[in-house]
Every structure is written in C-alpha cells, then in structure tokens.
C-alpha cells in the first residue's frame, strides 16, 4: 500500500507536468481512453456474469467519477500539488456523510469527530480568514465531494455489476464527455471560470509529451493494481490509513516541481485532514 501511495503521488506529479501542454479536459481524456479498450478486451474474452439492471446508477457512478477527475486535474494545474491531493482526500469524510443520509449507515461518535476535525482541516488549508475562499480551493473540495458520491454509488451497485463494468462506466464517461466538450468548445463563449471545461483538443504534441502521456497511463494502471492488491491482502481500515502517506509524497514532488513549501496554516490543515481520514478509517 505504501508503494501504491508513492505511485499515486508520482501520477499526480506527472499530471502537473503535463498541465503545461495539455488542458485538464485533455488529461481526463487520455487518462481514460486506454483503459476503455483494455476493459472492453477483458469483457470480450471473459463476459460478465452479474445481471446488473440499474443503468441509471451505473451512469451516475461514471458521471460522478468524471466530475471528480476533471476538478482534480484542474486543481493540480492551479494550486500546489500537496494541497490538491489533500483536498481530494477529503472524499472519505464526504462518504461518511452520504452513507449516513443516502445509505442509512450508522455514524459513530468517532466518525462525527472525524468529520469535525476534517472540516477544520479544510478551513486551515483554504484560509478563508477574509470570509471567502479561492475558486480553485472550492473546486478542489467539490472534487472531493464528487469522488465520495462515486464511491457511495459503487456501494449500491457492487453486488449487481461486474467490477470491470463499473470501471468501464467511469472510463467510458471519462472518454465520451471530453469528446463532447471538445466538439462544443469552438462554439461556446464560456466565462473564464469555466474555461477548463471547454478547452479545444489540440492533438499535436511534442514527442516528449506523448511519452509523458503514455507514462501517466501506465502509472495510473499500476497504482490501481497496487491498490487493489493491497485491499485484498490487508484490512480496509489499515489501507485507508496508509493511503494518506501519498500526501507527504505529493508535497515533496510538488516542491521539486516548483511549488511553494506549505506554510504553517496549510501544514496544520493537511495534518487535520489526515487525522480525520484516519479516524474515519478506524471507525469502520
């Protein structure tokens, strides 16, 4: 799991490097398109056995996952890598809230404490001492919420859909939606705040950019494989705790790429979110 966390942080660093040449929407497209073909190949050779039957939930999983990813890549491009990764890691806190309201799961006292701790962590990172937070930090938090919504949806369909079909819903939407936005981009006069959604597809990149794209796709696949392997070999609560080590890894990679080192308030916020995530993991 520690290796998975390191690889995940490296994947974030590669994405940040690519933001100099690719838009956030292009990153989402290239992140998913290869996976679609791989999953389709496996489904052709080993058809799924589960019946499914709730396509709307399958689509919602894909939509929430796509929304989380586009916001994640946007925040990687606009704020320090460590902060972007940390805000994305608020998803376990949001999962607890969604599970309580939508799935009627019990919320223990430890989980409630974790939510409060995590909330204060968000406050310290975004530093809204002037009663406002930056647009980029807000989208980072929203990305964490969408990731949580995707995880909550998986809980509803994991017993009726093959895992590969669930993955395909995410990667399929993550491939189709960018194509739609690419087609609309020349005809939409979007506000500056939404420019990351309607960036035009370039298609012509230097060779080194293609190398980084291919490397990112491989690293992403390796990270998912290591994560799956870790969950199959250890308790989910332990894995959840160790997964937060990708935050210090990300801070280190971000610093090497030119990010400013986190100040006292940011470090405090990161620590509180990690603590909140650990408490949530231990409460399960």
Predicted regions and their residues:
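Transmembrane alpha-helical segments that form core, pore/gating elements
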Residues: 13-16, 24, 39, 132-195, ...
């Amino acid at each position: 799991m520690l290796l998975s966390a390191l690889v995940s942080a490296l994947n974030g660093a590669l994405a940040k490097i690519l933001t100099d040449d690719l838009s956030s929407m292009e990153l989402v497209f290239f992140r998913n398109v290869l996976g679609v073909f791989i999953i389709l190949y496996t489904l052709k050779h080993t058809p799924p056995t589960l019946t499914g039957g709730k396509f709307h939930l399958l689509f919602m999983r894909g939509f929430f996952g796509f929304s989380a990813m586009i916001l994640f890549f946007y925040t990687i491009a606009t704020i320090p890598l460590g902060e972007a990764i940390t805000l994305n890691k608020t998803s376990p806190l949001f999962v607890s809230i969604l599970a309580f309201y939508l799935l009627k799961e019990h919320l223990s006292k430890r989980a409630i404490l974790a939510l409060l701790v995590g909330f204060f962590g968000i406050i310290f990172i975004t530093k809204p001492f002037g009663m406002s937070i930056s647009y980029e930090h807000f989208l980072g938090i929203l990305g964490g919420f969408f990731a949580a919504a995707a995880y909550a949806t998986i809980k509803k369909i994991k017993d009726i859909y093959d895992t590969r079909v669930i993955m395909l819903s995410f990667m399929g939407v993550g491939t189709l939606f960018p194509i739609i936005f690419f087609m609309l981009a020349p005809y939409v006069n979007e506000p500056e705040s939404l420019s990351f959604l309607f960036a035009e597809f370039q298609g012509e990149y230097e060779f080194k950019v293609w190398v980084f794209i291919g490397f990112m796709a491989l690293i992403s696949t390796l990270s998912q494989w290591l994560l799956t392997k870790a969950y199959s070999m250890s308790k989910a609560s332990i894995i959840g705790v160790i997964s937060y080590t990708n935050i210090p890894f990300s801070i280190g990679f971000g610093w090497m790429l030119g990010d400013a080192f986190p100040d006292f308030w940011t470090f405090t916020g990161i620590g509180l979110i990690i603590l909140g995530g650990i408490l949530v993991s231990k409460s399960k």
